[in-house]
Amino acid sequence: MPKKAGATSKGKNQTKEPETPPPPTGPVATDSKGFVTIAIHAKPGSKQNAVTDLNTEAVGVAIAAPPSEGEANAELCRYLSKVLDLRKSDVVLDKGGKSREKVVKLLASTTPEEVLEKLRTEAEKK
């Protein structure tokens, strides 16, 4: 049976919720609680601390500490706090304590754009 002109359908399409924008792609994002998080690819055992590369998946960070007994994790948080001009207590390892792929959470009030800009500046220094 053909539809009448001007008739509205009572399907699921009528009650469409407003679309939420997709989460930002990139290494720096905001979690559900509003904290800024950074995806890190750690490279422990380097000669000096440095941001080596910034790509869409993670920030490559060379760490001048051995990957034993959490030394590299502590040095990573220390180095990132210096680069981002934050207190050491505001930079916390969230995930990846025994992995090279880590997530660092920033407890200070900052935006992902500011963090990305500071990381880019540090990466260009090498």
From Swiss-Prot:
SMART domains: DUF167. The keyword 4Fe-4S does not apply. Pfam families: DUF167. GO terms for cellular component: cytoplasm. Residues 1-33 are annotated as: Disordered. The modification Phosphoserine is found at residue 89. InterPro entries: DUF167, YggU-like_sf. Keywords: Phosphoprotein. Belongs to the UPF0235 family. This is UPF0235 protein C15orf40 homolog.
